């Protein structure tokens, strides 16, 4: 989905033959649920067996293909929903933040389409612009019985100071005075209630246990 990007995103996507459709929209108000339902509609046209809902700033960790297939087909052939741990890459390609919430964020991003209703839909949220919409459909059968995968997601949305400031400013403009997320201070501050007791802590991605 291209929502009015001004960089080379569309051109880059078009260069990959695996990209089958690009949906463009401009000048629409922010609505995360609307956009996810549109992407779901597009994906379902392909009659997939599974869907993984990655944001534009996320990638699956390298060398995860065989592990995903093993979990889906051998370990958990009857499970409908899989959680993946988010690794927040921070300032350097091989470094991630690991204090507080950053050390234990799991996202339910991969779901199985077998025996699911035809009217799968992402639900609206209580936040402005339907922010913080779940990464799986609200009426997914088996959605309350997820399994934690060993596959991890690299999250680049907070990679450098410029991106962190941009994300912080965007969220506070969209959702000002938010107390549930502590004003989103965890994005750049070690003093947020979501940060660790010892301030910001970091580890090397290359040392993550498989």
Show the residue positions of the predicted features.
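Short, conserved SAM-binding/catalytic segment
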Residues: 15-19
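Short beta-strand-to-loop acidic/aromatic patch adjacent to the donor-nucleotide binding site
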Residues: 47-61
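Short amphipathic alpha-helical segments
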Residues: 11-14, 64-66
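Catalytic-site signature of metal-activated, phosphate-bearing donor transferases
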Residues: 33-37, 62-210
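Short His-Asn-centered micro-motif
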Residues: 1-3, 54-55, 82-85
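CheY-like receiver
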Residues: 23-27, 37
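A conserved acidic beta->alpha catalytic loop
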Residues: 2-12, 26-29
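Active-site nucleotide-sugar/metal-binding loop of Leloir-type enzymes
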Residues: 37-50
């Amino acid at each position: 989905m291209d929502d009015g990007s001004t960089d080379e995103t569309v051109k880059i996507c078009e260069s990959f033959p695996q990209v089958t459709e690009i949906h463009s929209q401009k000048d629409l108000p922010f609505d995360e649920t609307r956009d996810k339902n549109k992407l779901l509609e597009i994906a379902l046209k392909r009659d997939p067996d599974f869907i993984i809902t990655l944001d534009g700033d996320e990638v699956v960790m390298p060398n995860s293909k065989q592990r995903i297939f093993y979990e889906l087909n051998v370990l958990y052939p009857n499970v409908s929903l899989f959680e993946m741990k988010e690794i927040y890459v921070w300032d350097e390609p091989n470094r991630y933040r690991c204090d507080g919430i950053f050390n234990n964020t799991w996202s339910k991003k991969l779901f199985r389409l077998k025996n699911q209703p035809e009217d799968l839909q992402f639900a609206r949220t209580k936040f402005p612009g339907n922010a913080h919409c779940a990464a799986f459909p609200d009426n997914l059968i088996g959605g309350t019985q997820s399994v934690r995968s060993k596959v991890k997601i690299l999250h680049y949305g907070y990679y450098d100071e410029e991106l962190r400031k941009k994300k912080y400013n965007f969220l506070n403009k969209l959702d000002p005075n938010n107390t549930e997320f502590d004003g989103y201070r965890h994005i750049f501050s070690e003093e947020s209630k979501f940060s660790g007791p010892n301030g910001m802590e970091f580890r090397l991605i290359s040392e993550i246990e498989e």
